[in-house]
Amino acid sequence: MLESALKEQLKGIFAGLEANFTFDISVSSSHENKTELLELLGDVADCSDHITCVVNEGDALKFTLLKNGDRTGITFWGIPNGHEFTSLLLAVLNLDGKGKNFPDEAVCNRVKALKGPIHLTTYVSLTCTNCPDVVQALNAMTTLNPAITHEMVDGALYQDEVDALKIQGVPSVFADGKLLHVGRGEFGELLAKLEDQYGIDETKANAEVKEYDVIVAGGGPAGVSAAIYSARK
């Protein structure tokens, strides 16, 4: 399913993996998309000795990421193809500590301080260009805070749920069954909404406070000049 050039790229991307990952697949033997899902995940798993697939009979089409045999809280309902293929790769890399899309330490501490349990579900379209940013942000939060779980759902495969929830646009994020966010969203925006809804554990909210001699606000010519002047001093 994956082209050989892409497989070679994936071998390089996964070369540094240290943990062992499992795509724990649950799929109905009669599901029309079963072969496509198994071929995609099988091709990805072939690119690393640290990734394997386990297939179980189920009544849907989904898989959960396991790390060293333990559940990570990240589940994909559907086939993470198209724009969501990167979301799958980043989920593995983030769980292994190799990801590049984590925010700074202070923001990570805010995620860790969120009170749980929090169960998040994001409905997406594989052609949506705004969906991956939201999926990847929430997967990263799930990696940082064990009290969070996150499911990505391909709305095209679960149209009954989309209709029942009256979803009008994607991505649509639900937190424990309640609509939390619709449309494009940045990491900080999503985190702020979760903080408002669930609160934080003050004992974990220990973001490091740093002291600065000079702070330059703005990125225009004046800001650049001020930064250069300050560095010279």
Model-found features: residue ranges?
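Aromatic pocket-lining residues of Rossmann-like dinucleotide-binding sites
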Residues: S230
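Non-catalytic, surface beta->alpha helical segment in thiol-disulfide oxidoreductase systems
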Residues: K67-G99, F174-E202
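Local sequence-structure signature of Cys/Sec-based thiol-disulfide redox active-site neighborhoods
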Residues: E3-G42, V111-M152
